[in-house]
């Protein structure tokens, strides 16, 4: 159908991945795709004010316009500081 795009919305947890395909009108935003996917109702831990989003691993804003075939990704907050984890790994490696 002209004027319509299809995108995927993804949200990954350590034990499960959610992947929803949604059809939207051309010019739809990232936020509209997330809402249409139903993931906000399914996963109450998703807060669009806190969770960052991206398209194919590139950070985007909720108001950004989607293209046909895009994959919208909802990212979980970091639970550990990456620099601290690297430091700890380096210390463990130095002890071996």
Curated annotation (Swiss-Prot):
InterPro entries: Mopterin_synth/thiamin_S_b, RnfH, RnfH_sf
Protein origin, superkingdom: Bacteria
TM stretches of this protein: none
Protein family: Belongs to the UPF0125 (RnfH) family.
NCBIfam families in UniProt: PRK01777.1
HAMAP family named among the record's database cross-references: UPF0125_RnfH (MF_00460)
Protein name from the UniProt record: Protein RnfH
Lineage: Bacteria, Pseudomonadati, Pseudomonadota, Gammaproteobacteria, Enterobacterales
């Amino acid at each position: 159908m002209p004027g319509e795009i299809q995108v995927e919305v993804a949200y990954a947890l350590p034990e499960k991945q959610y992947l929803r395909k949604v059809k939207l009108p051309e010019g739809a935003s990232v936020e509209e795709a997330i809402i249409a996917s139903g993931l906000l109702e399914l996963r109450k831990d998703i807060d669009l004010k806190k969770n960052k989003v991206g398209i194919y691993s590139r950070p985007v804003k909720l108001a950004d316009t989607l293209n046909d075939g895009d994959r919208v990704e909802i990212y979980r907050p970091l639970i550990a500081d990456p620099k601290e984890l690297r430091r700890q790994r380096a210390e463990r490696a130095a002890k071996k």
